[in-house]
């Protein structure tokens, strides 16, 4: 799925610009995403608001803006809907025998986006399939790629000429 961490960061940067007239960098957007990024507007264990400090985009004077997970959930929703659409499309193209395995075992979320508060719950509720966050989501794709490259005989279907 091509929607993920960088798209979320762009959404946060645009949101802070439009909503708060604040200019923030990609690393600041990443910190916001990691601390208060959420896929749901209501969480059982909500993170505390994050104080974001940055320049006013017109005056360059400092701004101190408290940002809540609800606010970030709202600004990320469009891209999360794209993820949901891609999952739906993928499930629709999945052979029935593999589909049964997916329903039985669930789907593992990887990458930085997997760490969004409430993402696994939102997807589980929507698709009625258990979504899990991988043990090490930031490195699991690289580890899986290494495993596949070390065992090309078992994973030949992943290699294109």
Where on the chain are the PLM-derived regions?
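Conserved NTP-handling cores and scaffolds of large molecular machines
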Residues: 16-24, 36-43, 91-94, 127, ...
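Phosphate-binding glycine-rich/basic clefts of nucleotide- and phosphate-handling proteins
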Residues: 1-77
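Glycine-rich phosphate-binding loops at beta-strand->alpha-helix junctions
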Residues: 41, 99-123
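Glycine- and other small-residue-rich loops at beta-strand/loop junctions that grip anionic moieties
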Residues: 1, 108, 112, 134
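Phosphate/ATP-binding catalytic cores across multiple sugar-kinase/actin-like superfamilies
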Residues: 75-103, 148-152
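General structural feature for long, well-ordered alpha-helical segments within catalytic domains
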Residues: 8, 28, 32, 72, ...
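Conserved phosphate-binding/catalytic loops in two-lobed NTP-binding clefts
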Residues: 121-147, 155, 159-161
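Residue-level signature of catalytic and energy-coupling elements of molecular machines
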Residues: 12, 87, 109, 145
């Amino acid at each position: 799925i091509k929607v993920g961490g960088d798209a979320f960061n762009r959404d946060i940067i645009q949101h802070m610009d439009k909503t708060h007239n604040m200019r923030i960098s990609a690393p600041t957007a990443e910190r916001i995403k990691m601390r208060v990024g959420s896929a749901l507007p209501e969480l059982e264990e909500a993170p505390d608001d994050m104080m974001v400090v940055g320049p006013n985009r017109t005056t360059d004077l400092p701004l101190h803006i408290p940002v809540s997970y609800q606010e970030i959930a709202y600004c990320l929703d469009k891209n999360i809907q794209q993820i949901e659409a891609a999952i739906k499309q993928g499930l629709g193209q999945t052979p029935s025998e593999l589909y049964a395995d997916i329903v039985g075992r669930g789907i593992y979320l990887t990458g930085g986006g997997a760490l969004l508060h409430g993402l696994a719950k939102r997807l589980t509720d929507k698709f009625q399939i258990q979504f899990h966050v991988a043990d090490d989501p930031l490195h699991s794709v690289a580890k899986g790629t290494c495993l596949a490259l070390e065992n090309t005989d078992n994973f030949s279907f992943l290699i294109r000429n």
